[in-house]
Curated annotation (Swiss-Prot):
It catalyses: [ThiI sulfur-carrier protein]-S-sulfanyl-L-cysteine + a uridine in tRNA + 2 reduced [2Fe-2S]-[ferredoxin] + ATP + H(+) = [ThiI sulfur-carrier protein]-L-cysteine + a 4-thiouridine in tRNA + 2 oxidized [2Fe-2S]-[ferredoxin] + AMP + diphosphate; [ThiS sulfur-carrier protein]-C-terminal Gly-Gly-AMP + S-sulfanyl-L-cysteinyl-[cysteine desulfurase] + AH2 = [ThiS sulfur-carrier protein]-C-terminal-Gly-aminoethanethioate + L-cysteinyl-[cysteine desulfurase] + A + AMP + 2 H(+). Its EC number is 2.8.1.4. ATP binds at L184, Y185, R266, G288, Q297. GO terms for cellular component: cytosol. One of its GO terms (biological process) is thiamine biosynthetic process. The gene is thiI. The lineage of its organism: Archaea, Thermoproteota, Thermoprotei, Desulfurococcales, Desulfurococcaceae. GO terms for molecular function: ATP binding; CCA tRNA nucleotidyltransferase activity; tRNA binding; tRNA-uracil-4 sulfurtransferase activity. Pathway: Cofactor biosynthesis; thiamine diphosphate biosynthesis. It comes from the Archaea. Pfam families: ThiI (PF02568), ThiI_fer (PF22025), THUMP (PF02926). It is found in: Cytoplasm. Catalyzes the ATP-dependent transfer of a sulfur to tRNA to produce 4-thiouridine in position 8 of tRNAs, which functions as a near-UV photosensor. Also catalyzes the transfer of sulfur to the sulfur carrier protein ThiS, forming ThiS-thiocarboxylate. This is a step in the synthesis of thiazole, in the thiamine biosynthesis pathway. The sulfur is donated as persulfide by IscS. This is Probable tRNA sulfurtransferase. Belongs to the ThiI family.
């Protein structure tokens, strides 16, 4: 028997009610279809009660379909599986034994069964009967606590699904469940993970990169943005806004006292990002700040730079350590790019970790109204990496 379906599970969507649940399930199906198509998998996506079923046209696509499905927000876990029809519990157990028989030969195993919409037998009945058949076919014994192999059976009506792996997905909510947001994105560890975490909560995240005139930093940021979009942004078309901030940095360095320069630049970026978000219809800003990680990210300084903003500033990394952030970057596939990013702050002196509010306001007023050129905008799904870099003057 070859895998002919992929079972897709979700958790948080299941606790929603009525219209909200139905809407989120539709968003999940749309994102799954897009991810599968991008992976070159031909399949039909079908909604079941509490599950999504990916019905494969080619059994050879099972592994690719499972990988693609596990990259969709809202998915708790996925399992390549064999779908069969059965006439009764004996027929079900025989077909399951045909699938699992060689897999458990000589191995200590257990059976885990679930059923829905079935009368006439229980999950325990399935486990006992299948376990008996597998022992007769050469299994090495049963251990319910620490088996070498677990045979999973899920019964739904007159169909059953056999599988032996449960691969985790990202969880969260499908993209589109929440309103769109704009992430201040540098291409480093923090901002990439922050954007991913808000995408995971259902917000279509777009990215704004503030360019201080360092080509290496811009190139890494574009590559990271393309990777984030290409691996995780299913169900929408994320945009990258490249903002020329070189002039702003020069003015700040020339007019603002050294100990306030980083904070003033950060507030300028937040105010500009807020205006950009308002024009584009985004309803929140996202930053990668972690409380106390650097001097500009103390509680006092975070209050100073974001005071009075109309849009909420989402800081999903606020309580995370740097090691946790780096590890999450590795998990989501951004580590190898983010580790190449160069440190660019735009100013030549770190801030006071306990800056004076009065002093900060006084220094910020010196540059409040400086001109910032309109951003260059790129479709991260529709434009190639080479095309974007060429437009930015980073490729011939």
């Amino acid at each position: 028997m070859e895998y002919n379906v992929v079972l897709v599970r979700y958790s948080e969507i299941a606790v929603k009610g009525g219209y909200t649940r139905s809407r989120m399930e539709r968003l999940l199906l749309r994102a799954l279809e897009e991810s599968l198509a991008a992976a070159g998998v031909e399949a039909e996506v079908e909604r079941l009660q509490g599950r999504v079923l990916v019905r494969l046209r080619s059994p050879g696509d099972a592994a690719a379909a499972a990988r693609a499905s596990a990259r969709v927000f809202g998915v708790k876990s996925v399992s390549p599986a064999v779908e069969v029809e059965y006439s009764g519990i004996e027929d079900l157990a025989e077909k399951a034994a045909e699938f699992f028989g060689e897999r458990v030969r000589g191995r200590v195993f257990r059976v885990r069964a679930r059923r829905s919409g079935v009368e006439g037998f229980t999950s325990k009945d399935v486990e006992r009967l299948l376990g008996k058949l597998l022992l007769e076919r050469g299994a090495g014994g049963v251990d319910l606590e620490k088996p070498e192999y677990t045979a999973y059976v899920e019964v739904r009506g007159r169909r059953a699904y056999f599988f032996d792996t449960i691969n985790p997905g990202p969880g969260g909510l499908p993209v589109g469940s929440e309103e769109p947001s704009l992430a201040l994105y540098s291409g480093g560890f923090d901002s990439g993970v922050a954007a991913w975490m808000i995408m995971r909560r259902g917000s279509p995240v777009h990215l704004a990169f503030y360019d201080f005139g360092v080509p290496e930093a811009l190139e890494v940021a574009v590559e990271g943005a393309k990777t984030l979009a290409g691996e995780w942004a299913w169900g929408y078309r994320p945009r990258l806004y490249v903002v020329n901030f070189r002039g702003a940095a020069l003015i700040v360095n020339g007019l603002v006292k050294p100990s306030y320069r980083t904070l003033v630049l950060r507030r300028l970026m937040l105010l500009h990002a807020q205006d950009l978000a308002a024009r584009e219809g985004f309803e929140a800003l996202v930053t990668g700040e972690s409380v106390g990680q650097v001097a500009s990210q103390t509680v006092r300084n975070l209050r100073l730079i974001s005071s009075g903003l109309e849009l909420p500033v989402l800081r999903p990394l606020a309580g995370m350590d740097k090691d946790e952030i780096v590890e999450k970057s590795r998990e989501i596939g951004l580590y190898d790019i983010a580790r190449r990013q160069v440190e660019v702050c735009g100013v030549d002196q770190p801030p006071n970790p306990r800056a004076s509010p009065q002093g900060f306001r006084s220094e910020f007023e010196k540059v409040r109204d400086i001109f910032i050129p309109p951003p260059r905008v790129f479709d991260l799904k529709g434009e190639s990496l080479h095309s974007i870099l060429k437009t930015l003057g980073l490729r011939g």
